[in-house]
Amino acid sequence: MGSHVAQKQHVVCVPYPAQGHINPMMKVAKLLYAKGFHITFVNTVYNHNRLLRSRGPNAVDGLPSFRFESIPDGLPETDVDVTQDIPTLCESTMKHCLAPFKELLRQINARDDVPPVSCIVSDGCMSFTLDAAEELGVPEVLFWTTSACGFLAYLYYYRFIEKGLSPIKDESYLTKEHLDTKIDWIPSMKNLRLKDIPSFIRTTNPDDIMLNFIIREADRAKRASAIILNTFDDLEHDVIQSMKSIVPPVYSIGPLHLLEKQESGEYSEIGRTGSNLWREETECLDWLNTKARNSVVYVNFGSITVLSAKQLVEFAWGLAATGKEFLWVIRPDLVAGDEAMVPPEFLTATADRRMLASWCPQEKVLSHPAIGGFLTHCGWNSTLESLCGGVPMVCWPFFAEQQTNCKFSRDEWEVGIEIGGDVKREEVEAVVRELMDEEKGKNMREKAEEWRRLANEATEHKHGSSKLNFEMLVNKVLLGE
């Protein structure tokens, strides 16, 4: 083995196989690469092939010290580009991924052109990797891609079962009255109600895959060498402090897209390595360049949310009624079991003031001066990118910890207005107008601008909290100094 190969530390990065998890893990991988680590980035075979289709035949060529590998996810093979069913995927990765992952590590360590594996950085929902790390005798860092408040709620999921709050007896318990039940026993999370807790507890089935999966993964997190979170101390300080008594060292190193820009640069060779499973339509940036400051509403429900055809129509006519210009990302698989089609009359009525895209470079969109508001599902990447762009939000949480993100955006960070789950065009129109035109929207924009400044400080300043936490993670955990 060549000495130059042996000297590098080798980190294997394993994202959960969904777009909103792959992107932040790619940023962690690039940050570590910029620090001189050899990187192996492990996608599932299905997503490996999707990357080839969306980004071209060289998408996973990598670089000499940044390699791509893949393992099967255990599900039937398909080449249809859709977001996989999350419960099915969770159950499959938990049951079927450990053996092929251990075999991949064995193959890597048998090669003489790469350094031996010295650490594993895995998504918090791929904790089967802990077994492999323990067998190899290398440290394992778990990356929970949620907000800190979302992760803390997951750490307390077991208490909801102990207290008889989950599973619920039947669907009648999903009333407003029951969902308004106070939850006052999660430290540092104030004025919580049952409806603000990540949605998997709302099941009637004690054997529900997601309820049990989350409890298991949150418990296994205690075995990690460290936990990393894509957040920053100023935003979630109290929550981060609370979880430090439950899990191993916690390092908040976000917002990752800002830290990555600082450390590796988006135009460097590694900076251009992408991880989007849909082809990005950059024409939307050209369109935004022609628009006035804070004049455009950006609408995107992320990579997993599905709407009913009726909800899509209500959102469409609500947006049309605002009279505002808008950029709306409509994935091909946005409508459950059907093609996402907006009414032709809507297209005609809004022809001169809208742009529709199937996917777009969201970080760049949310940092564009033309964007004045964001209608979002409150996924954590979207929420954080909105804060970093100084953009206030209309919040329509769909599932998982999006409900928790919505509550904190609304009440703690003061940058969000919530819209009811049962979408009505009149409400869409009213809240978008409130966001874009009224005093409340103006105040939220000022607050978002303040968070933008603090996010930049955390990642850009040499004594910024996230910058220092990242250095500590590298030196203490990955290098063991």
Swiss-Prot record:
* Tissue specificity: Expressed in roots, shoots, leaves and flowers.
Q: Could you tell me which Gene3D superfamilies the record lists for this protein?
A: Glycogen Phosphorylase B
The GO terms describing molecular function are: glucuronosyltransferase activity; UDP-glucosyltransferase activity
Can you tell which superkingdom this protein's organism belongs to? Eukaryota
Class in the EC hierarchy, top level: transferase
Q: Fetch the PANTHER family from UniProt.
A: GLUCOSYL/GLUCURONOSYL TRANSFERASES (PTHR11926), UDP-GLYCOSYLTRANSFERASE 85A1-RELATED (PTHR11926:SF774)
What's the protein here called? UDP-glycosyltransferase 85A2
| Organism (species) | Arabidopsis thaliana
